[in-house]
């Protein structure tokens, strides 16, 4: 099965790092490089396993993290230590930390500008007959709360769960399902379930190839704004809803 899905349509490497910092409640001013590098590489590995079209920037960031990690493992000399003995003048994490803080500010400003733009759009005078349909259209185009990386984390968890339950002697029969067919199946399944269903319940088949196609179909439906992904709190169960249900 070959299917290329461009990751850039969702996020970038700095977004992934910010996601990990938020998900694991990491202090951005004191990043545990070994831990976050392991998590970052795990996500990139999953994206490559899914045959997503991973941008070169992700690999550059991976190399940067490994370089910082190796520097952090080097012995510290006395002249590198400040008078209080707690911090180091030449912290290998400094540049990355500054980039993350700057990028986080940029994202916050971009979000605020988008919200203001949506507010201004609602102030335009339109005939009353068209106002309701316009409002619904604006609501369906709001940004998704769940990111690609939340979805990858859920898929990793799902794969671990399926692997743990699967008998070692199980013989796998390879099946190839067109992603377009799986997208149609998911939309029909949502319709039967009243427009909303648990993300995990979409994966009724234990075969890895089918699970991958299902996950890619969900991403494509997200990108096409045919479904909404909802998660109330961090680490909570993820639900998939059709736009008609959420409107």
Swiss-Prot record:
Matching InterPro entries: ScpA, ScpA-like_C
Keyword vocabulary terms for this entry: Cell cycle, Cell division, Chromosome partition, Cytoplasm
GO cellular component, one term: cytoplasm
Protein localization: Cytoplasm
GO BP annotations, alphabetical order: cell division; chromosome segregation; DNA replication
Principal cellular location given in the protein's record: cytoplasm
Cell cycle among keywords: yes
Top-level taxon in the UniProt lineage: Bacteria
Transmembrane segments: none
Gene3D superfamilies from the UniProt entry: 6.10.250.2410, Structural maintenance of chromosome 1. Chain E
Coiled coil regions in record: none
Annotated S-S bridges: none
PANTHER family on file: SEGREGATION AND CONDENSATION PROTEIN A (PTHR33969:SF2)
Quaternary assembly: Component of a cohesin-like complex composed of ScpA, ScpB and the Smc homodimer, in which ScpA and ScpB bind to the head domain of Smc. The presence of the three proteins is required for the association of the complex with DNA.
Entry-linked NCBIfam families: PRK00104.1-1, PRK00104.1-4
Primary role: Participates in chromosomal partition during cell division. May act via the formation of a condensin-like complex containing Smc and ScpB that pull DNA away from mid-cell into both cell halves.
Family to which this protein belongs: Belongs to the ScpA family.
Protein name as catalogued: Segregation and condensation protein A
Organism from which the protein derives: Bacillus cereus (strain AH820)
């Amino acid at each position: 099965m070959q299917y290329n899905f461009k990751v850039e349509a969702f996020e970038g490497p700095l977004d992934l790092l910010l996601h990990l910092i938020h998900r694991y409640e990491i202090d951005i001013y004191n990043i545990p490089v070994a831990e976050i590098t392991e998590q970052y590489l795990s996500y990139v590995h999953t994206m490559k396993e899914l045959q997503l079209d991973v941008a070169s920037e992700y690999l550059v960031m991976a190399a940067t993290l490994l370089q910082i990690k190796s520097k952090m493992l080097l012995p510290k000399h006395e002249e590198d230590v400040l008078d209080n003995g707690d911090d180091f003048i030449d912290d290998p994490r400094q540049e990355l930390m500054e980039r993350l803080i700057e990028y986080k500010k940029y994202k916050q400003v971009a979000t605020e500008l988008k919200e203001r733009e949506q507010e201004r759009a609602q102030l335009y005078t339109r005939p009353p007959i068209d106002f309701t349909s316009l409002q619904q259209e604006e609501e369906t185009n709001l940004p998704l709360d769940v990111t690609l990386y939340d979805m990858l984390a859920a898929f990793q968890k799902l794969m671990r769960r399926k692997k743990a339950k699967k008998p070692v002697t199980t013989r796998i029969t390879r099946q190839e399902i067109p992603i377009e067919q799986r997208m149609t199946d998911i939309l029909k399944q949502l319709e039967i379930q009243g427009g909303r269903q648990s993300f995990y319940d979409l994966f009724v088949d234990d075969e890895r190839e089918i699970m991958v196609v299902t996950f890619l179909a969900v991403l494509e439906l997200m990108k096409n704004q045919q479904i909404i992904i909802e998660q109330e709190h961090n680490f909570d169960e993820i639900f998939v809803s059709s736009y008609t249900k959420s409107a």
